[in-house]
Amino acid sequence: SYFVWKEKPKFKFTSIHFWVLLFGFWMLVSTIFNIRVSSDYAWFKYNEFVKVLALFIFITLTVKTKRDIDTFIWAIVLGLSAYAGMEAVKFILSGGGHRIVGRSGILQDRNDLAVAINMAIPLILYLWSVTKHKHLKIGLIGLALLNVVAIVGTYSRGGFIGLVILAFAIWLKSNRKLLFAFIAILAMPILYANAPTEWKERQATVETASTEDGSFIGRLWAWKIATLIALDNPITGGGFKATTDAVLWRMYANETPDFGPIYTKPIPPELTPKAAHNIYFQVLASAGFFGLFVFLCMLSKAYFLSQKNKSRSKKAGIKWSQTLSDAICLSLVAYGITGLNVSLAYFELVYAMLGIIVAIDANKLYEKPVE
């Protein structure tokens, strides 16, 4: 539709464009010089990432007004949060017996789904703030609460930790801190007492994860191998999903026990290679130290530009833009924290958020009243 648009808005190249495209270019370089045994798979994953970059570009080209942004956010919420809400209802009706996972595809893993839900909750709260219809506002609050339940229902420890930190960040920004703190103090013991036993047992393993939890130990192995790959290939890394290459995994497996600050038992020879399960180690293994630097610069620039949009909106009295910029900052914080537990460095929702930040900045929506 953009190509047949008669009056195309003028394109503005921003600092976020620079960092996103530089990251895309560096992933191309790392793919060209990938060290996987099956290089075709690295190219397959790069082609998938190109589609994500295309999504970012088209958002910055076509999303120009508050109406465009709200429509796009509604699409995200109805597609992601509504699914999480339905799964939360099943979790409640089953007395906690229903284990929530995503649909087949990129968010099928429960940890990945928990990250996405954490990122979407601030967007639900934004829609609540700009919605005037009373019943719709009630529905959005209900949806936000169901999304909280959905994170619990994934049994994801990282997702739950991210939820706690997100809730704390939202509380810090609220105008009724004492009231919400009082409600939380009363509600948390009751909710915990009625939580499923299996859920409480899983959350209790956080303290002993490094020595007793096989899932977490597997992550430590993957993080060590990711670092070893980057140390041997500091500029370009090993290419997409380098840690999942069986030959590379076995090549570095013997070096893992005493490598790094945490001792881990030797990797069993029969163990299947593990994904990085951490966005930072994922990029480090895939694109080297320079790639990780660009990735961190991209996320940092997005966060601080959104904060700048928030400040400019507040100064101009544009409440919706201020609230949205604040919500996006919270979503990025949720991603940065829960990303410690998942391999979602190339997640579409992140680049969609970056596109919205660009739309607000490039079109100066922070100073334009709603028509």
Predicted regions and their residues:
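Central hydrophobic cores of alpha-helical transmembrane segments in multi-pass inner-membrane proteins
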Residues: 1-7, 53-58, 284
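Transmembrane signal-anchor hairpin modules in multi-pass inner-membrane enzymes, especially those
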Residues: 1-29, 39-40, 44, 64-74, ...
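Alpha-helical transmembrane segments of multi-pass inner-membrane proteins
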Residues: 24-32, 50-55, 68-99, 105-173, ...
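Membrane-interface micro-motifs in multi-pass membrane enzymes
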Residues: 44-48, 106-117, 279, 284-288, ...
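A membrane-periplasm/extracellular boundary helix in multi-pass inner-membrane enzymes
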Residues: 89, 94, 149-153, 171-214, ...
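Long extracytoplasmic/lumenal interhelical loops at the membrane interface
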Residues: 100-104, 209-224, 232, 236-287, ...
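Membrane helix-loop boundary segments at the extracytoplasmic
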Residues: 278, 282-287, 319-361
